[in-house]
Regions:
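Acidic-glycine-rich active-site phosphate/pyrophosphate-binding loop
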Residues: 1, 102-117, 214, 268-278
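N-terminal, positively charged regions that mediate nucleic acid binding
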Residues: 1-58
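Glycine-rich anion/phosphate-binding loop at the beta-strand->alpha-helix junction
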Residues: 13-20, 135, 210-300
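Acidic, glycine-rich active-site loops and adjacent beta-strand->loop/helix elements
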Residues: 17-18, 30-31, 46, 86-88, ...
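Glycine-rich, N-terminal phosphate-binding loop and its surrounding beta-alpha-beta segment
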Residues: 43-109
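Structural signal for hydrophobic packing residues in well-ordered secondary-structure cores
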Residues: 44-52, 84, 88-90, 112, ...
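A structural-propensity feature for long, helix-poor, extended segments
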Residues: 50-69, 163-190, 194, 208, ...
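Glycine-rich, mobile lid/loop segments that gate access to catalytic sites or pores
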Residues: 113-233
Length: 300
């Protein structure tokens, strides 16, 4: 069972939903990189459930403990160990379903692979709870990227039949304003159109009250990434980003830029023509999501 992602910068995760703790080991960070624990806590708070009927009813403190690799607010250059204690565990709630195969869950596949030795409590290692370790490790890296002028922002594209305003991918200035608006939000319910918030929340709560759930899409933009980052073919930007994205439980599809919409375009419509603007090369449109040949071209 391999639980490590990355090579030059690698994150190894550990833990189970109802175990004593979950966490990760982040290896490859250079020495002397500032680590803001308040920023990490803010990222964790955006992920954390609030018992408001919009996500899991399980509420955890999600306090990240930095066990190694950080001294006096800076990385030491050695592995950074992060741990989050599990406090709200009620394994007895799963006793009646211990021998049932829940649809849409990894109960059967985990049994087939681990022959019954897997920790099935709360989904064990397959639980969405483990994404807290991804957020903790990601927050350390996100802070470093932010100081390098690279911002990553995400909003809810569509959920429960309610759509948000899409990113202005062809207009870097407008996209920058959208990014600032999202970064200024203090909660984890990221929307660009405030009028979509209440209808979306109402639909989510209605499904929960009926014992059901809803699906959705997220839209992410990376701003400030210079041209020339990535590799062709097997280690392309798309390959690496998709690899990590599919590590999040329940993710079943991903597209870059116009994505599957290319099926309805002609080549002349899909091409992103290059031009000069402000002394730098940009593209007139951004159907390809700032990526050509697996390598960034400087567009979002």
């Amino acid at each position: 069972m391999k639980n490590t992602f990355g090579s030059a910068l690698a994150l190894t995760i550990f833990g189970e939903s109802h175990g004593r703790a979950i966490g990760g080991v982040l290896d490859g960070m250079a020495a002397g990189v500032p680590v803001d624990e308040e920023f990490i806590a803010a990222c964790m708070d955006k992920r954390r459930a609030r018992g408001d009927g919009l996500s899991t009813p399980r509420v955890e403190a999600d306090k990240v403990q930095l066990l190694s690799g950080v001294v006096n607010g800076h990385t030491t250059g050695t592995a950074i160990a992060l741990m989050i204690e599990n406090q709200n565990t009620r394994s007895g709630d799963y006793a009646k379903t211990a021998d049932l195969l829940r649809p849409g869950h990894a109960d059967y596949t985990a049994y087939a692979k681990y022959h019954g030795f897997q920790d099935a409590r709360g989904g064990g290692h397959f639980s969405g709870r483990i994404t807290a370790a991804l957020v903790a490790g990601g927050a350390v890296v996100l802070g470093a990227l932010d100081r390098a002028g690279i911002n990553i922002v995400t909003h809810i594209g569509r959920c429960a039949g309610v759509a948000d305003t899409p990113f202005a991918l062809d207009d870097p200035a407008a996209l920058g304003a959208q990014a600032e608006a999202l970064l200024s939000r203090g909660d984890g319910f990221a929307l660009l159109n405030g009028e979509a918030e209440e209808p979306m929340k109402a639909a989510i709560r209605a499904a929960g009250s009926a014992g059901d759930s809803v699906g959705g899409t997220l839209e992410t933009a990376i701003l400030g990434l210079p041209a020339g980052v990535g590799e062709p073919y097997f280690d392309s930007m798309e390959s690496e980003l998709a690899h990590m994205a599919f590590s999040v439980p329940a993710v079943k599809g991903i597209e870059f830029g116009t994505g599957f919409g290319f099926a309805d375009l002609k080549g002349s419509e899909a091409n992103d023509a290059f031009r000069m603007q402000g002394g730098r090369i940009v593209t007139a449109t951004n159907h390809n999501a700032g990526l050509n040949g697996g390598i960034s071209n400087g567009m979002p």
